[in-house]
């Protein structure tokens, strides 16, 4: 009889087919889709002489921590980062403070964390520096609330770090305009009006240096004050000590005065460090919390510390949010004439 052998053959064939079918995923899903993913917008170089500086090591670290497929999305500008986050091409990105503020204000991007500066802070303070004995210094030091050192800046010669620099121009001018000391001169929608606003409040000799000139940058602004070319220098809270307050005096600049000659007026506001941005409309709170925890874990291991140092150029990361990290900066620069249009053009953002 042939029935029994035929039955056995059919049984074997069905068993083999069942095994094959059991190992095949549905046609709309493959192995890569069984895990969540994370895309990081990052400016990637064509080649890295030091492999430890390659952001791929950051990607690999986060992939292991999150159990996600983490990839890099190459970008070439801050504007491209904003666009990538807006339209969901990338999930997170490390950004410049000014571009981050634009992304937050115009497109409701959020902040997960921020990098630390060498002193552990996630910001630096912008200040006006004057010389001891000046009427501005005396007004500040006299403990008399009726004497206002900022009002006394009117008509003086200012020393800025450069055109549209944060601590050297945007933050102090945003403060002076926003608090009614200075009045915008010209078209309030044109960034060029800021130059006339500066000379209108201070005087025509306001020092707004170009790159490569003697008074450019933080050192240049303090030099401008020190040699009395100007009456006030706008710089960071740490600037004077960096150039003129070293324990070994040979490290000080030759134009420095004694540290007791410099008086720091109250701060205008905070310039933020680089934040890690994301789009809350694309990433839910649970995933955002997981990503933040993985990023902060970089602080906790030798491997993570190497990535922080070599790839991100920071001693550490701190959890924060957009309001806390960008609010002080934005509250001041919003008073600068034409600033939104300027940033839109600078970062090539299409509305």
What are these regions (language model features)?
Residues 59-63, 125, 130-144, 249-320:
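Extended ligand-binding regions for polar small-molecule ligands
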Residues 34-40, 46-57, 283-351:
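An extracytoplasmic/periplasmic, membrane-proximal ligand-sensing/linker region
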Residues 72-83, 87, 96-99, 184-223, ...:
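Short helix-initiation/N-cap motifs at beta->coil->alpha
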Residues 58-66, 154-156, 166-215, 246-247, ...:
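Ligand-binding cleft/hinge of the Venus flytrap
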Residues 94-108, 175-178, 218-259:
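A ligand-binding cleft/hinge motif common to bilobed small-molecule-binding domains
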Residues 115-184:
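A conserved helix-loop-strand patch within extracytoplasmic ligand-binding domains
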Residues 35-101:
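Extracytoplasmic small-molecule ligand-binding "clamshell" domains
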Residues 1-29:
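Secretory targeting signatures
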């Amino acid at each position: 009889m042939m029935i029994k052998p035929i039955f056995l053959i059919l049984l074997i064939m069905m068993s083999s087919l069942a095994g094959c079918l059991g190992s095949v995923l549905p046609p709309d899903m493959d192995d890569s889709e069984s895990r969540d993913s994370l895309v990081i917008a990052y400016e990637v170089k064509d080649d890295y002489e030091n492999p430890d500086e390659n952001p791929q090591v950051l990607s690999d670290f986060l992939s292991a921590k999150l159990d996600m497929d983490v990839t890099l999305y190459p970008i070439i500008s801050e504007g491209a980062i904003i666009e990538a986050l807006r339209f969901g091409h990338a999930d997170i990105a490390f950004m410049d403070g000014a571009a981050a503020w634009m992304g937050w204000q115009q497109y409701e991007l959020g902040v997960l964390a921020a990098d630390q500066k060498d002193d552990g802070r996630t910001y630096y303070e912008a200040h006006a520096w004057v010389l001891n004995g000046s009427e501005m210094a005396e007004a500040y030091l006299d403990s008399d609330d009726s004497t206002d050192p900022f009002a006394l800046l009117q008509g003086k010669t200012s020393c800025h770090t450069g055109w549209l620099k944060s601590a050297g121009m945007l933050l102090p001018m945003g403060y002076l305009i926003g608090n009614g000391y200075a009045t915008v001169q010209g078209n309030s929608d044109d960034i060029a009006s800021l130059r006339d606003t500066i000379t209108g409040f201070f005087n025509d000799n306001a020092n707004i240096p170009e790159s490569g000139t003697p008074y450019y940058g933080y050192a240049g602004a303090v030099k401008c004050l020190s040699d009395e070319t100007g009456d006030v220098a706008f710089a960071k809270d740490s600037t004077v000590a960096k150039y003129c307050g070293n324990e070994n005096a040979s490290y000080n600049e030759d134009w420095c005065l004694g540290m007791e000659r410099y008086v720091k007026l109250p701060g205008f506001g905070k310039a933020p460090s680089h934040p890690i941005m994301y789009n809350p409309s694309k990433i839910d709170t649970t995933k955002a919390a997981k990503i933040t925890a993985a990023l902060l874990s970089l602080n906790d291991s030798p491997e993570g510390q190497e990535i922080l140092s070599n790839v991100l150029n920071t001693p550490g990361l701190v959890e924060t949010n957009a309001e806390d990290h960008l609010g002080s900066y934005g509250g001041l620069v919003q008073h600068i004439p034409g600033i939104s249009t300027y940033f839109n053009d600078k970062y090539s953002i299409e509305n």
